């Protein structure tokens, strides 16, 4: 086999995802009839529009990673007939192998009675959540056009997305002296942290494993009430959810005197000038930090307001914009001496995806796949079709415990504050 052409070298911020072979996936439950040929045409059009998605990764002689073009066509959709299931399992191999040395993008369709399950797997070095959501939306839009008109739409090949480092350099943003993590130094080794049992996680190089995930959905009414509550108190949904997660973690940890370090990504597309299109960059994220000092009388509105105030201050002084330039390519979890970190993504608002007549989206689920021996523990949030989704990813002893407590808090807060739907 002859080596392919190198498209470009992965940047520092992208290499961490290559080192741990990190893929993200979005699984969509569909009800109705699926036109497999039209979906195949839509997927081909997506790849022609974003040709870099058909590439793969190769390690370079200096230990880094290269993005390499393939001479062969992408393998296309993997279709599994789940209607011939035995013992509840679809016929064929439903476990798609994820191999970054072969492909960075996969699409799997499992046909079921009355519908299907569609999963798009995307290597994290090529796309963050915002970028990935736009690709899924484009796939469904092209599929709808292919079904209704016979044509998946115009194709204009897009350039290879830029790394975070390249985008920041274009805008004159350079590494400063502070990363934002300095606010955690005051609690480093300042408390006696109770020992917790760490689950063993076996890494299998070349075979990324699914990270367990549990999740909750709020109803449209519950989500609407929560958003109205936030507007009343001039708070974003992200801030209210973050405060609820931190209050829940404080309660479950049973260490009331120990502050909680909180870290969350900030989509810099909304911050930089000129703005950046969703698929113009790979992982265009800054890291925001907050030290939650919670007590028995801590109020969710006060906590959320302080999170927002801290974020605004860090954006104003430029810390968040350059924060990603400070971090290495090794993931080691919470640093020694620091209380366990809480990490949560911002609530991405997914567009209401187009579907042809007779096909409906019933459910959406995200998942991570990676080869890493450090146990993961993180929250992710999204809003789809007016409903808030919170997922808890990781190797956690009681995965549903925190989510149920978060649900209870988020659903009771509007009424406890006397907010009533008119």
From Swiss-Prot:
<feature type="site" description="Important for mas ACP domain recognition">
    <location>
        <position position="312"/>
    </location>
</feature>
<feature type="modified residue" description="Phosphothreonine">
    <location>
        <position position="198"/>
    </location>
</feature>
<feature type="site" description="Structural role in the organization of the active site">
    <location>
        <position position="128"/>
    </location>
</feature>
<comment type="similarity">
    <text>Belongs to the acyltransferase PapA5 family.</text>
</comment>
<keyword id="KW-0443">Lipid metabolism</keyword>
<dbReference type="Pfam" id="PF16911">
    <property type="entry name" value="PapA_C"/>
</dbReference>
<comment type="subunit">
    <text>Monomer. Interacts directly with the acyl carrier protein (ACP) domain of the mycocerosic acid synthase (mas) protein. Interacts with FhaB.</text>
</comment>
<keyword id="KW-0808">Transferase</keyword>
<keyword id="KW-0007">Acetylation</keyword>
<keyword id="KW-0444">Lipid biosynthesis</keyword>
<dbReference type="InterPro" id="IPR031641">
    <property type="entry name" value="PapA_C"/>
</dbReference>
<keyword id="KW-0597">Phosphoprotein</keyword>
<dbReference type="GO" id="GO:0008374">
    <property type="term" value="F:O-acyltransferase activity"/>
</dbReference>
<protein>
    <recommendedName>
        <fullName>Phthiocerol/phthiodiolone dimycocerosyl transferase</fullName>
        <ecNumber>2.3.1.282</ecNumber>
    </recommendedName>
</protein>
<keyword id="KW-0012">Acyltransferase</keyword>
<feature type="active site" description="Proton acceptor">
    <location>
        <position position="124"/>
    </location>
</feature>
<feature type="modified residue" description="N-acetylmethionine">
    <location>
        <position position="1"/>
    </location>
</feature>
<dbReference type="GO" id="GO:0016747">
    <property type="term" value="F:acyltransferase activity, transferring groups other than amino-acyl groups"/>
</dbReference>
<dbReference type="InterPro" id="IPR023213">
    <property type="entry name" value="CAT-like_dom_sf"/>
</dbReference>
<dbReference type="GO" id="GO:0008610">
    <property type="term" value="P:lipid biosynthetic process"/>
</dbReference>
<dbReference type="GO" id="GO:0016740">
    <property type="term" value="F:transferase activity"/>
</dbReference>
<dbReference type="GO" id="GO:0071770">
    <property type="term" value="P:DIM/DIP cell wall layer assembly"/>
</dbReference>
<comment type="function">
    <text>Catalyzes diesterification of phthiocerol, phthiodiolone, and phenolphthiocerol with mycocerosic acids, the final step in the phthiocerol, phthiodiolone and phenolphthiocerol dimycocerosate esters (PDIM) synthesis. Can directly transfer the mycocerosate bound to the mycocerosic acid synthase (mas) onto the substrate alcohols. Is also able to catalyze acyl transfer using various nucleophiles as acceptors and several acyl-CoA thioesters as donors in vitro; preference is observed for saturated medium chain alcohols and long chain acyl-CoA thioesters.</text>
</comment>
<dbReference type="GO" id="GO:0005829">
    <property type="term" value="C:cytosol"/>
</dbReference>
């Amino acid at each position: 086999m002859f080596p392919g052409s190198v498209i470009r070298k992965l940047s520092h911020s992208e290499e961490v995802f290559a080192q741990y072979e990190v893929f993200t996936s979005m699984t969509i439950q569909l009800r109705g009839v699926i036109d497999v040929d039209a979906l195949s045409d839509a997927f081909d059009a997506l790849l022609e529009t974003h040709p870099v998605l058909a590439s793969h990764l190769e390690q370079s002689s200096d230990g880094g990673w290269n993005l390499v073009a393939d001479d062969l066509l992408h393998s296309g959709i993997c279709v599994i007939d789940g209607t011939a299931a035995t013992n509840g399992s679809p016929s064929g191999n439903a476990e798609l192998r994820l191999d970054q040395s072969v492909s960075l993008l996969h699409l799997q369709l499992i046909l079921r009675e009355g519908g299907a399950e569609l999963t798009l797997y995307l290597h994290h070095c090529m796309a963050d959540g915002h970028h990935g959501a736009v690709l899924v939306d484009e796939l469904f839009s092209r599929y709808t056009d292919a079904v209704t008109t016979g044509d998946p739409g115009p194709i204009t090949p897009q350039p290879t997305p830029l790394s975070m480092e390249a985008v920041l350099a274009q805008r004159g943003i350079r590494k400063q002296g502070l990363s934002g993590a300095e606010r955690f130094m005051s609690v480093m080794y300042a408390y006696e942290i109770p020992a917790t049992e760490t689950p063993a996680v076996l890494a299998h190089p070349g075979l990324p494993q699914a990270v367990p995930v549990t999740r909750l959905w709020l109803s449209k009414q519950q989500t609407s009430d929560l958003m109205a509550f936030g507007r009343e108190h001039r708070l974003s949904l992200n801030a209210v959810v973050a405060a609820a997660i931190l209050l829940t973690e404080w309660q479950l940890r049973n260490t009331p005197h120990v502050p909680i370090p909180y870290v969350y990504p900030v989509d810099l597309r909304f911050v930089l000038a000129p703005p950046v299109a969703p698929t113009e960059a790979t992982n265009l994220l800054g890291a925001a930090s907050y030290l939650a000092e919670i007590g028995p009388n801590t109020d969710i509105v006060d906590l959320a307001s302080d999170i927002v105030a801290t974020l605004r201050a860090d954006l104003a002084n430029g810390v968040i914009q350059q924060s990603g330039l400070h971090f290495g390519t090794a993931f080691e979890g919470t640093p020694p001496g620091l209380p366990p970190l809480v990490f949560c993504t911002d609530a991405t608002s997914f567009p209401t995806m187009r579907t042809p007549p007779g096909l409906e989206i019933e459910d959406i689920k995200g998942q991570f796949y990676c080869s890493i021996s450090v146990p993961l523990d993180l929250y992710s949030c999204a809003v789809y079709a007016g409903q808030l989704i919170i997922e808890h990813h990781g190797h956690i002893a009681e995965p549903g415990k925190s989510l149920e407590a978060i649900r209870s808090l988020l659903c009771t807060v509007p009424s406890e504050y006397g907010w009533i739907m008119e």
